[in-house]
């Protein structure tokens, strides 16, 4: 490992030397070897959700939000209506995407520390039969709250509606089985729990829905139907692919399998989260969420109630000790966030806790 700080963020995150070294090779975007690399990545991604029988994996250049916008724009018909479930900033982003795309939508918003319930969704769908799709965030990255995906998905299926899942911060670490959870689209990205680098999103699109989506898209570049059709025909991307990102993700997926796949990745992140929560509690810092709805991905902490605490100063001091934290993203209270993901283990998390404790002493922050 270099002397670069450890990124305790929800992505981009700290990657392994092997993953970074995979980007030292240049690839021809139309070359057969690169096409095989793309196909291998998509095959491995589908295997994580046991989705090869029911879904296509459609990769897309750009951040995860590019892929979310592409999924909504491609799969929601122009006369469709989306019910957007919100309990944080990324749910708000789903609604903004629908608005910009001109898709009819309604929203249901709960407090930032309250998961949406299946009963909420049941009531909302019963009251509005015009809804065609429901969009939700699985793990809301602004807090780390985990929404009850399985229960909500069953309600949506019972009402005959279609589910779009933003699984950006959960895919690869939390179990999602396409054979058990009915969804039309699930979206994730290269630079999160798979421990690749940012630059590629991907959409698991239900096969029949994708086949029926021709002409829906608002954009040429974000047309997932066209993207998939071209890849299926030629093995190639329509437009210049992020070759180095894909090579890094391929290497990261090899390491994912070597570690033990999803169960092992989940366990390491859960151990990281426990170390973080226990350590921060020991120095008096309170987590924002109760344990039963806290995902082991990113943890939000209340900022110290002391005039000597200023986040910018705190951040720079912790960075000088080797750790990059994340600012809070809540609307009502001052917080900061610490990620549990990336190439880091419990020992690294304890070192981060020790750094935070040292910094608070240096700042003479007493009222925690």
Swiss-Prot record:
GO terms for biological process: organic phosphonate catabolic process. It comes from the Bacteria. It catalyses: (2-aminoethyl)phosphonate + pyruvate = phosphonoacetaldehyde + L-alanine. Signal peptide: none annotated. Gene3D superfamilies: Aspartate Aminotransferase, domain 1, Type I PLP-dependent aspartate aminotransferase-like (Major domain). The modification N6-(pyridoxal phosphate)lysine is found at residue 192. Pfam families: Aminotran_5. GO terms for molecular function: 2-aminoethylphosphonate-pyruvate transaminase activity. Homodimer. This is 2-aminoethylphosphonate--pyruvate transaminase. The gene is phnW.
């Amino acid at each position: 490992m270099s002397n670069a700080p450890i990124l305790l963020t929800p992505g981009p995150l700290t990657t392994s030397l092997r993953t970074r070294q995979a980007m030292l090779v240049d690839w021809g975007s139309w070359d057969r070897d690169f096409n095989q690399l793309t196909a291998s990545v998509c095959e491995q991604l589908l295997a994580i959700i046991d989705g090869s029988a029911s879904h296509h994996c459609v990769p897309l250049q750009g951040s995860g939000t590019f892929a979310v916008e592409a999924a909504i724009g491609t799969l929601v018909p122009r006369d469709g209506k989306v019910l957007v479930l919100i309990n944080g900033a990324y749910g708000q982003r789903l609604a903004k995407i629908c608005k910009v795309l001109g898709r009819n939508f309604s929203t249901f918003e709960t407090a930032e520390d309250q998961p949406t319930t299946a009963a909420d969704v049941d009531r909302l769908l019963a009251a509005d039969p015009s809804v065609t799709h429901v969009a939700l965030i699985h793990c809301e990255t602004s807090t780390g709250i985990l929404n009850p995906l399985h229960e909500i998905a069953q309600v949506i299926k019972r009402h005959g509606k279609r589910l779009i899942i933003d699984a950006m911060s959960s895919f690869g670490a939390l179990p999602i089985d396409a054979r058990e959870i009915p969804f039309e689209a699930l979206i994730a990205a290269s630079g999160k729990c798979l421990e690749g680098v940012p630059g590629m999103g991907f959409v698991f699109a239900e096969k029949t829905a994708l086949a029926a989506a021709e002409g829906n898209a608002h954009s040429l570049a974000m047309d997932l139907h066209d993207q998939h059709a071209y890849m299926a025909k030629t093995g190639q991307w329509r437009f210049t692919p992020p070759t180095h990102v894909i090579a890094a993700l391929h290497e990261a997926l090899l390491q994912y399998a070597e570690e033990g796949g999803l169960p092992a990745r989940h366990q390491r992140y859960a151990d990281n989260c426990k170390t973080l929560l226990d350590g921060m509690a020991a120095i008096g810092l309170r987590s924002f969420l109760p344990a039963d709805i806290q995902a082991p991905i990113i943890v939000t902490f209340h900022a110290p109630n002391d005039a000597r605490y200023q986040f910018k100063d705190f951040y720079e001091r912790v960075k000088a000790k080797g750790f990059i934290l994340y600012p809070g993203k809540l609307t009502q209270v001052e917080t900061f966030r610490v990620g549990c993901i990336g190439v880091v283990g419990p020992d690294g998390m304890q070192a981060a806790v020790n750094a935070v404790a040292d910094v608070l002493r240096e700042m003479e922050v007493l009222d925690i």
